[in-house]
C-alpha cells in the first residue's frame, strides 16, 4: 500500500506506525496531541496556499486525532468532562472549517493544544 503513496506520505505513514508500536498509554496521548498540532499547522499552510485537497486531508487527520483522544478519556477522572468538551469543541471548529478555514480559531486551538501537550509531557516526567 505504501508503494502507491507519494514518497513523503509513505515516510509519514511509516513514521506514524513506528511510533505507535510499543508505546505506552501516556506516549500515545502525547503522540495524538503532537499529530493533531502538526496537522493544524498543515491546515494553516494548505489554507494559505488555497490547497483544498491539503485542507481536507489536514482536517481529516485532525478529526481522527481528536477522536482517538476522545476515546482515550477516562470519564471518571477529574478532568474527563473538561477534556471531552475541549476535544468536541475543537472538532466542531474543524468541521465548520471545511468550506472556509477560521484561521484565528485554528491558531488559538493550536496554541491551547501546545500548552496541553507541554503539561502532559511535564506530568510524564515527574
Region spans (language model):
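N-terminal intrinsically disordered, cationic/polar leader segments
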Residues: 1-40, 47-48, 53-58, 64-72, ...
